[in-house]
């Protein structure tokens, strides 16, 4: 029998699909990545092509194995981690999506949310799903598809349509339509799942007109869901045995499996999660109560704050403003000036997330004077990411009653030393960057490996979280407080736009 030497993590993100191959020591052996098309039909709308998502993800799996000559019979299991909330509805008979995937960033369902609020469902949603009533989550996206795609509602009521977040879609495709499943972490992001009873909420399905037959089966984040023979040379069937939404996978990859441990992922958005164990903490400060993974992949509760625009605001500097040619250049230009020269950039391009939850706020640059140059704007954009993180962390500490001694960080933007140092200064907290920053993939791999006995216990994994660098705060309290007050004023300017939305075309 061939020794199964590897675990593969499929990391399906907002802008790219990746496959990461790891060995038993959790070393990364091979990586493949492919970007895919971002579709913007109109202002505030964001879509992906589900078939392109699957095509890019499956090709990266083949490429990652092929780079190192790894056969499929050498792979013990596959774990999946994915962009959350992004919504796909497809016909189970044809296997084809009825519409593009509606991405988590998309704000088209703001009016549906207003209608649900007017019908008195806001507090019910908060109490039973742990979420706030916002276009961010999947439920209103499903309703929009059923209401706006010709024939969709009729087919749904006839039992022909299936709903899934991206993990569900990938597993369904990889098992040739045999398995329609999700895990607790992804289900908890739909605004359709009752986190008290751990089941789909029949009242919310009824209120949004979504047939229960569309919903996937919900399972733990670490168990065998099905098998696939996609990729690889030998055609051996490989177990798919780990699923977690990207942020919960990162939390697990950072080994934040006990109550009170927290991390921030700096990706397209920024996501701060704190594991609260078996205690459901209801936020008083605009945070989400959601589901994460306990030590064995069982559901545990967590607090989460989401910042919609993190790394995406650096992309904006590159792609729209043309101030930099590469995202890595932002650190160089930000350090060419000592301060932002009084400038604040609030990147509310698709509204504001936690703790504000203002769907109508818009991006704002304040404090401009004749002496402001491009370096100041670049620096202020990076500082805006750190300020938004403080907004969330302050709320999280108030809700949980826990003062963090350190924040664990991951994601692409943590390579930016200026951002990490400024983050530490703004928080007055140590920031720890791990040696292996691919913690989202690590989390998916750990969950998959534990399910098939590739790793025997959580204790075996605990020692793998080595720190690359710790950033210590250097800013004095007076300066920290003064600058943060300026940020709060800038946020109010961004929110003022919501009062003027009747002036938009």
Curated annotation (Swiss-Prot):
Q: Which family does it belong to?
A: Belongs to the FGGY kinase family.
Is Heme among this UniProt entry's keywords?
no
Protein name according to UniProt: Glycerol kinase
InterPro entries xrefs? ATPase_NBD, Carb_kinase_FGGY, Carb_kinase_FGGY_CS, FGGY_C, FGGY_N, Glycerol_kin
Lineage here is:
Bacteria, Pseudomonadati, Pseudomonadota, Gammaproteobacteria, Vibrionales
Keywords, ordered alphabetically: ATP-binding, Glycerol metabolism, Kinase, Nucleotide-binding, Transferase
Summarizing activity control, the record says:
Inhibited by fructose 1,6-bisphosphate (FBP).
Q: What is its EC number?
A: 2.7.1.30
Can you cite an annotated GO cellular component? cytosol
Q: Which GO terms describe its biological process?
A: glycerol catabolic process; glycerol metabolic process; glycerol-3-phosphate metabolic process
Which reaction does this enzyme catalyse, per its entry?
glycerol + ATP = sn-glycerol 3-phosphate + ADP + H(+)
Positions with a binding annotation for sn-glycerol 3-phosphate: 14, 84-85, 136, 246
Pathway(s) the chain acts in: Polyol metabolism; glycerol degradation via glycerol kinase pathway; sn-glycerol 3-phosphate from glycerol: step 1/1
Give the binding site residues for ATP: 14-16, 268, 311, 315, 412
